[in-house]
Amino acid sequence: MLERLCSAFADEGAKTLLVDACERAPAPDELSVMGLAECIETLSPELSYLAARTLPLRHVDAQGSTAPFLQAIVEAAPRADVVLVHAAASELSRMFARQTITSYPRPLLIADDHPASVTHAYAAMKLLALRARMSVFGLVLGAAPHSPRAERIAEQLSSCADNFLGAVLDGWALIDPACRPTEPLPPALRRLVRGVLRTAPGAGPSRSARAAPIGDLLPALN
């Protein structure tokens, strides 16, 4: 699903850096002790990748925040229009709660259409809302194209966000995990990505430090 998400940003003309800091991400390159720029791998003209498991904790400050890691990322990738940070909600809350890089972080929840995953998605949304004061969320839902549960799940999360957290689920998109990378991007995914880009000042891709925390809420990864 992350591949399709990155493709959608590329289609909007944005150069994306995917920072993979989840528990199952590859270990960071040994050169990371010298600086992050040397560890960023260019996958295509529109997409770069940083294996970042355990890297945020190397940048923890005296208050327990890993916000300095975001600053290091921005300095290491000055040409990136979008930074996608793929990590657990607990890690993202430490990273974004006290950061000053952007006033427009946009958390995107990634879930599938099973009850345990939906419960986990709500728990992550609650954690980010309370600890990092994030209030506008997006949802990327992995499910078959005609899943009878997909729309109901989005409605349920939207209702819970509004009624219990004072937050908003501003958009959602369904991605078929079995689809081929060459298949056309779903229109809903295009709309979701355009909404993320609109949260930053100015029009169109620009060097405005759009950092989108991506909380991977699939149970196997948490």
Question: What does each model-identified segment do?
Answer:
Residues 135-222:
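C-terminal lobe/tail of nucleotide-utilizing enzymes
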Residues 4, 24, 53, 58, ...:
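Arginine residue identity/basic-tract feature
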Residues 68, 72-75, 81, 85-174:
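Conserved catalytic-core segment of NTP-binding enzymes
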Residues 11-82, 89-90, 98, 155, ...:
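P-loop/Walker-type NTP enzyme "switch/lid" segment
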Residues 1-11:
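Glycine-rich P-loop/Walker A and Walker A-like loops and their local beta1-loop-alpha1 context
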